[in-house]
Amino acid sequence: MRTGELGIYLSSLELYCELLKDSRDYYVICEDDVFFTPEIRKISSIVNNCPEDWDMIFLGTNKEYCKKENSDRSYSRLTGKCMPGAFGYIIRKKCAQYFVNFGFPMEEPIDGLFMRNFENLNVYEYSPNCVFVDYDDKSTTIHNSDEV
């Protein structure tokens, strides 16, 4: 695992622990290098219109790996065949507790942990994208950092 991936993993689990103590039911979590689309203003609507059983809602898709982009507002259930990208998502308290319980030992980046557990959770991808990452931008440090 790279140092940047380790940092995201640990800070994500720290946020999940904070959510468990918070009165809110969910957090919106984004990496620091995301770009927002106007769709981000609709977070409350996205949450309220998602199927009631949701645990996580991914807000952006890495088109390199998930070749689906829909201009209609829609929710797609994720099954573990595709990881949209952990750069922007909404996580419910129940799901945060799940990852706090099963997040250690750290064996892979956080998105690998997510994908490996899609079958145990109700995970959706919202379209169109609310956030995206410019993978061509050399300023991102996640994939350019040293191995731990």
Regions found by a protein language model. Name each.
Residues M1-C30, V34-V148:
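An acidic/histidine-cluster motif and surrounding catalytic segment
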